[in-house]
């Protein structure tokens, strides 16, 4: 049976995997966290899209000609659980992958990207600040940026002995500098209106 609607799935149960996810032909975008289905926000706002495009441009220009690659949503990132099950599938707004082996199948990133960016939107902030924060930490994503359009600030978290350590928020009018890629620096005026 072809799955074309979330109504055909049991959203209360877990145990779904990337293999299941690939069989679905849903109109809605979903993510899997620990085998559970999470509906993604509908089409992002104009502000979200502007920030995403500006960051994408900055990251593309920085990584052009380098070994790392930049990907934007929708792009599947599969983060296997400790038991090896592929039951975590997320679509970050932007991610940087430096290990070509993680891209070997040409369809997804299998394993932790080096840097992930999520842009908060109404309806996804708890998911990005809670569930996905812990998932990225557990998967050992080196650096996680949370962009807050309403506050015009960026929170950067870096992995330190297996746990995320938050840096001081980068506010409007300041420079955002990556810890993982220290020569990558973006002025907030270039991403926020």
Q: Which residues make up each language-model segment?
A:
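Gly/Pro/Ser/Thr-rich low-complexity, intrinsically disordered segments predominantly at protein N-termini
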Residues: 1-193
